[in-house]
């Protein structure tokens, strides 16, 4: 379901799942920060607010993540390097992590393969190794839940990008 790759001073946590909904609808659900994206967030993600835009590239959001007894506030800018297929959230507050959503056609016309992956900065030493170990075990289940919620939302309605 997911993987962790070590590369230099970063590591990646990702999860991939087949979503039983058309790729366009899946992508539009992810890209719509007004009505789609809020409905796919696991309970650890709270207070998602759109500061600017709200549909795909140019969107600026703030949100909080509660895990391990702490709440961290994030601010992220959204880009679409490959609109309709790749959406990227680059954190500019709270963390320097970058999360990428990739939507590809599934094995049927009405399905999509979706990957959520985040690149984290690795901190040096033992504390960095512990942080990576804990982060992997906390984030993996959150991404699995987000993919389950995405399937439920995208399969049940049509979000649209307008």
Language model features with spans:
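Glycine-rich portal/gate segments that line the openings of hydrophobic small-molecule binding cavities
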Residues: 48-95, 111, 125, 145-162
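Beta-strand/loop substructures that line and gate deep hydrophobic ligand-binding cavities in soluble
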Residues: 88-145, 161
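A short, structured loop/turn motif at beta-sheet edges
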Residues: 20-24, 55, 80-84, 102-113
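Hydrophobic ligand-binding cavity/cleft-lining segments
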Residues: 2-52
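Hydrophobic beta-strand positions in extracellular immunoglobulin-like domains
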Residues: 19, 65, 118-120
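Hydrophobic/aromatic beta-strand elements that line small-molecule binding cavities or substrate pockets
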Residues: 15-17, 74-80, 98-105, 118
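Residue-level detector of alpha-helix boundaries and kinks
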Residues: 11-12, 22, 63, 88, ...
């Amino acid at each position: 379901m997911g993987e962790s790759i070590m590369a230099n001073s970063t590591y990646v946590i990702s999860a991939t799942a087949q979503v039983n909904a058309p790729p366009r609808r899946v992508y539009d659900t992810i890209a719509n920060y007004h009505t789609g994206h809020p409905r796919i967030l696991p309970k650890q993600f709270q207070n998602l607010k759109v500061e600017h835009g709200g549909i795909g590239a140019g969107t600026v959001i703030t949100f909080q993540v509660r895990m391990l007894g702490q709440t961290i506030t994030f601010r992220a800018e959204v880009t679409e390097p490959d609109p309709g297929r790749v959406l990227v959230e680059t954190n500019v507050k709270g963390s320097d992590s970058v999360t990428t959503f990739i939507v590809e056609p599934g094995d049927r016309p009405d399905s999509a393969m979706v990957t959520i992956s985040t690149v984290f900065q690795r901190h040096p030493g033992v504390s960095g190794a512990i942080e990576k170990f804990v982060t992997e075990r906390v984030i993996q289940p959150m991404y699995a839940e987000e993919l389950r919620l995405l399937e439920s939302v995208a399969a049940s309605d049509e979000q649209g990008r307008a």
